[in-house]
Curated annotation (Swiss-Prot):
Interacts with SIZ1. Belongs to the ubiquitin-conjugating enzyme family. SMART domains: UBCc. The lineage of its organism: Eukaryota, Fungi, Dikarya, Ascomycota, Saccharomycotina. This is SUMO-conjugating enzyme UBC9. Pathway: Protein modification; protein sumoylation. It comes from Saccharomyces cerevisiae (strain ATCC 204508 / S288c).
Length: 157
């Protein structure tokens, strides 16, 4: 890990511990030897109140490359997560996570998790990553909503 990457991730952790959005969690993963792996985090994103996603806390992994913050982290839900902008592998398709689109080195973990939370209830139909969820969202909203509610129940605490 480059010193710039390490320095930035230490700063991110410090900022997150001081100030993070209510209902969210994020922490570096512990390695087998008990030390922290600052390049891999586990986080949870609550569904917004008043949406079909409410009641669930959705787990993600955030993996930072050695080139961070020049390159964005890879952010993933569990494989098979049902959403039009999530690949079957769980990888999230979001412009702020794409270095060829809106990624900027100043983007923080807090901005990333808030962006993912917004994406849950406001999918981008022009950037489909998963055919079944995209098709339901585009053509059969009632079926889509039913599947989202089932998933919210699956991830409720």
């Amino acid at each position: 890990m480059s010193s710039l990457c390490l320095q930035r991730l230490q700063e991110e952790r410090k900022k997150w511990r001081k100030d993070h959005p209510f209902g969210f969690y994020a922490k570096p993963v512990k390695k087998a030897d008990g030390s922290m792996d600052l390049q891999k985090w586990e986080a949870g994103i609550p569904g917004k109140e008043g949406t079909n996603w409410a009641g669930g806390v959705y787990p993600i992994t955030v993996e930072y490359p050695n080139e961070y913050p020049s390159k964005p982290p890879k952010v993933k839900f569990p494989a098979g997560f049902y959403h039009p902008n999530v690949y079957p592998s769980g990888t999230i398709c979001l412009s702020i996570l794409n270095e060829d689109q809106d990624w900027r080195p100043a983007i923080t973990l807090k901005q990333i998790v808030l962006g993912v939370q917004d994406l849950l209830d406001s999918p981008n139909p022009n950037s489909p990553a998963q055919e079944p969820a995209w098709r339901s969202f585009s053509r059969n909203k009632a079926e889509y909503d039913k599947k989202v509610l089932l998933q919210a129940k699956q991830y409720s605490k």
